[in-house]
C-alpha cells in the first residue's frame, strides 16, 4: 500500500486529497472504494494488481505518469517487497528503452484521431453544437496525449499536464492548443471545433517523422477533406 500525489511529494494544499493505492496479487477481486472525508480531506483508495502496476512502465502513455508518481511515493505497507522493487525500477527508468513503443503509439493514435476531425466536419454541416463540442474535446485530449508521448514529457501532477506539454511542443502548438480551448478570443461551438482541427493539423506536422506510411496517408487525406 502506497501514498501517492501531492501529500507524498510534500506539496499538499488545503484542497489536496489523500491518494492511496493498494496493490494486490493477480486474481484478487478489485473492490471499489467510495471516497470519503478523513480529517477534512477527501480520501481515495484505488486497488490495482501488482502485474497491472508494473505493466504501466511498459506503456509509453502510462509510464509518463507512473514513473514520477512512483518515484515520489511514500510506502505505507510492503509485505511482499513490491514497493521496494518498484522504487529500484523507476530509479533507473530510461525513456529511450520505450522509444520504439512510443513511436508506434504516436503513429497509431494520430491516425485514429482523424475520426474526430471528420466528426467535426459532419457536426458543422448539421449545425449540431453538442456533437461539435464533444468531437472537439475528444480531439484536443488526443492531441495532448500524442505530443506528451512524442516529446517524452513526464507528468508529475495533473495540474501541470497542459503546461508542460505546451512547453515541450513549442509556441506554435501551444497557441493552437489555447485556441482550441477558446482561451484567446471568443468562439462559438463551431469555431472552437475548427480550432481543434487546426490543433490536429499542427500536431500531425510535428510528429510527421514518427508516422508510419499508412498513418501518414490517413492524416493527409483527412486534412485534405476538411480543407476541401
Predicted regions located by residue number:
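Short aromatic-enriched loop/helix-cap "lid" or pocket-rim segments at secondary-structure transitions
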Residues: 14-15, 57-58, 159-161
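Conserved short hydrophobic patches within well-ordered secondary structure
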Residues: 2, 86, 143-147
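Conserved nucleotidyltransferase catalytic core and NTase-mimicking acidic/glycine-rich helix/loop elements
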Residues: 95-228
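Conserved NTP/Mg2+-binding pocket subregion across the NTase superfamily
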Residues: 33-34, 38-125
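Catalytic metal-binding acidic patch
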Residues: 1-49
